[in-house]
Amino acid sequence: MSAPARRATPAATGTVVVMTTDTVTLTGLRAVYGTGTRRVTALDGVSTSFASGTFTAVMGPSGSGKSTLLHCAAGLDSPTEGTVTIDGTRLNDLGDNELTRLRRDRIGFVFQAFNLVTTLTAAQNVELPLRLAGRRPPAEDVTAALDAVGLADRAGHRPSELSGGEQQRVAVARALITRPAVVFADEPTGALDSAASRQVLRLLRGLVDDHGQTVVMVTHDPTAAAYADRVLLLADGRVVDELTGGITAAAVAARIAVREADPAGASRHAATLAGPSC
């Protein structure tokens, strides 16, 4: 069986809808926290987009802004400045209830922690987001989501009866059940061994190649990043480099090493990527 097909979802009444081939567009994002001597700029004018049906890895050292970028892009946090557009809808135009509905219906989340309910079966965990929203998912949709991650035969198993890799694949199926426009994955292999990591990364790659899913993944691992179509490198809240085409773990690691050896050059390249200031 194939993964659940994406469902067209009307935009909330009164919001601005823009037709685009990019599933996610970030424009001039700044995220500033604290005041005075405690003021921290987590994102500093980030503008980028994530095309439909592509797999992007976001990398950078601790404090580079990669998790903040993902949280702002996914509507989990609000930027200080700038706009976020997902599937044609500007998040800045949404009220709290509308934003909650958009996250629930059009965004899938996969985190390092599996966050499965231990007393529920795999199938029950997958359908939980819809049940919490007062909807009863058709059994065939739950089966299709589990089949897409290769776990249709484990539907009745509880998390304690599944390996770590299987639990993360259940989490991916849970992210797919709403037929999202984009799946955001934050260090999805961080708690897994190398074999289980490969399973999850191949799964994410397959969702893009076989079903046209858009995936944005934060990772610190060049091997994980090599599964992506595109790698964004962040430092000090800015996009300082980008890799596309023929991405390998060695190429990613080498680019990171060059950037760390020449931070001034990285800053100049970041300014080039950002384009002329307004």
Describe the residue ranges of each PLM region.
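Short coil-to-helix segment of the ABC ATPase nucleotide-binding domain corresponding to the Q-loop/switch region
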Residues: 120-128
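Conserved ABC transporter NBD signature motif
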Residues: 82-93
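Conserved ABC ATPase signature
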Residues: 158-168
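ABC ATPase NBD coupling module
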Residues: 35-40, 91-108, 132, 249-253
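Catalytic Walker B motif of ABC-type/P-loop ATPase nucleotide-binding domains
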Residues: 183-186
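The feature captures the beta-strand-to-loop junction immediately N-terminal to the Walker
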Residues: 59-61
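Conserved catalytic motifs of ABC-family nucleotide-binding domains
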Residues: 179
